[in-house]
Curated annotation (Swiss-Prot):
Protein location: Cytoplasm
Gene3D superfamilies with a match to the protein in the record: DnaJ domain (1.10.287.110), Heat shock protein DnaJ, cysteine-rich domain (2.10.230.10), Urease metallochaperone UreE, N-terminal domain (2.60.260.20)
Organism: Bacillus licheniformis (strain ATCC 14580 / DSM 13 / JCM 2505 / CCUG 7422 / NBRC 12200 / NCIMB 9375 / NCTC 10341 / NRRL NRS-1264 / Gibson 46)
J domain sequence ranges: 5-69
Repeat region (CXXCXGXG motif), residues: 145-152, 162-169, 188-195, 202-209
Keywords linked to the UniProt accession: Chaperone, Cytoplasm, DNA replication, Metal-binding, Repeat, Stress response, Zinc, Zinc-finger
Quaternary structure and partners: Homodimer.
GO biological process, one term: chaperone cofactor-dependent protein refolding
InterPro entries associated with the record: DnaJ (IPR012724), DnaJ_C (IPR002939), DnaJ_domain (IPR001623), DnaJ_domain_CS (IPR018253), HSP40/DnaJ_pept-bd (IPR008971), HSP_DnaJ_Cys-rich_dom (IPR001305), HSP_DnaJ_Cys-rich_dom_sf (IPR036410), J_dom_sf (IPR036869)
Zinc finger extent (CR-type): 132-214
Matches recorded under PROSITE patterns: DNAJ_1, DNAJ_2, ZF_CR
Protein name in UniProt: Chaperone protein DnaJ
Family of the protein in this entry: Belongs to the DnaJ family.
Record function comment: Participates actively in the response to hyperosmotic and heat shock by preventing the aggregation of stress-denatured proteins and by disaggregating proteins, also in an autonomous, DnaK-independent fashion. Unfolded proteins bind initially to DnaJ; upon interaction with the DnaJ-bound protein, DnaK hydrolyzes its bound ATP, resulting in the formation of a stable complex. GrpE releases ADP from DnaK; ATP binding to DnaK triggers the release of the substrate protein, thus completing the reaction cycle.
Length: 375
């Protein structure tokens, strides 16, 4: 019959401390001791608890058990050498990984590491994106706990060097292979690879050394930013780990649409209405731009769709490469609801032009009947 997991037997997790393992053993040994518990199977359970405790309370045995479980790494190599037996619960991948360094090349858990980057989405008006601005934003991020100065330990105490790994954050485990014994390095499960153990945790941060706070950051938005672009604010991300540098803050811009202007890169586009008289006779009109009103001369005979350009009236290039232009497309508006006098003037114009229109007024139903008759 296969043996139960020792951690399961004692009812503790795999990262349990020695004190937690000892406490669990005392409770269960008292419960199942043959002199106290006369139920059938109690003696076997007591034996199982004792065996689990003897293994997990010994650092070397525990490390060996964590590596191999209940399997004996030497089994399968008795008198027959390689013949017929298995390799003690591990495969050739594990063997070669250990021998040739695959398992040893691990990042030092105590090495300085850069903090995580943060992202903040900012909504800008059309004009704010065009001209830029200075603003203050507030972001939630982790800060060093002021109570413990980031140590994670209760004030008046300090983290202690892990007695199991000597502060390295790693344990050396001896592994038997068909090629001999190999020493493999694993993350120390007593300190989770930190090399430190905190016996008395800070009540403010719970031992993490960090607390969540909202921080105000001044941001200078350059002129010419566009929708979807982002601004990097160096060093304003999450704080570094083990003395490493802080991460960065990335501000992503969302630019609102304008009711009159449209933007394409650094250029601005808009439509301007012209009356029939303005288009035919020409005129000087006022055109709104981001920089104020500008006079534009419209030549006589201008047609719908004619384009004009106002140089330098667009958006500044965000990288400083000049200034965009403003493009104007004119639309000639056909007059409606004419007075009789206006109609007479247009009739005169049409007659002089030799293009007198047919002004027969028909009802909608008359037009439908005429269409069916083919008139």
């Amino acid at each position: 019959m296969s043996k139960r997991d020792y951690y399961e037997v004692l009812g503790v997790g795999k990262s349990a401390s020695k004190d937690e393992i000892k406490k669990a053993y005392r409770k269960l040994s008292k419960k199942y001791h043959p002199d106290i518990n006369k139920e059938a199977g109690a003696a076997e359970k007591f034996k199982e608890v004792k065996e689990a405790y003897e293994t997990l309370s010994d650092d070397q045995k525990r490390a060996h058990y964590d590596q191999f479980g209940h399997t004996d790494p030497n089994q399968g190599f008795g008198g027959g050498g390689f013949g017929g037996g298995d390799f003690g619960g591990f495969g050739f991948d594990d063997i070669f990984s250990s021998i040739f360094g695959g398992g040893a090349r691990r990042r030092d858990p105590n090495a300085p590491r850069q903090g995580a980057d943060l992202q903040y989405t900012m909504t800008l008006s059309f004009e704010e994106a065009a001209f830029g601005k200075e603003t203050t934003i507030e972001i939630p991020r982790e800060e060093t706990c002021e109570t413990c100065s980031g140590s994670g330990a209760k004030p008046g105490t300090k983290p202690e060097t892990c007695s199991h790994c000597g502060g390295s954050g790693q344990l050396n485990m001896e592994q038997s292979t068909p090629f001999g014994k190999v020493v493999n390095r694993r993350v120390c499960h007593y300190c989770n690879g930190t090399g430190k153990q905190i016996k008395h945790k800070c009540s403010t941060c719970g031992g993490t050394g960090k607390v969540k706070k909202r921080k105000k950051i001044n941001v200078t938005i350059p002129a010419g930013v566009d929708d979807g672009q982002q601004l990097r604010v160096a060093g304003q991300g999450e704080p570094g780990i083990n003395g490493g540098p802080s991460g960065d803050l990335f501000v992503v811009f969302r630019v609102q649409e304008h009711e009159f202007f449209e933007r394409d890169g650094d250029d601005i586009y808009c439509e301007m209405p012209l009356t029939f008289a303005q288009a035919a006779l020409g005129d000087e009109i006022e055109v709104p731009t981001l920089h104020g009103k500008v006079k534009l001369k419209v030549p006589a005979g201008t047609q719908t769709g004619t384009k004009f350009r106002l140089k330098g009236k667009g958006v500044a290039n965000v990288r400083g490469y000049g200034q965009g232009d403003q493009h104007i497309v004119v639309r000639v508006v056909t007059p409606t609801n004419l007075t009789e006098n206006q109609k007479n003037i247009l009739r005169e114009f049409a007659e002089v032009s030799g293009n007198m229109p047919d002004e027969q007024e028909m009802s909608f139903f008359d037009k439908v009947k005429r269409a069916f008759k083919g008139d």
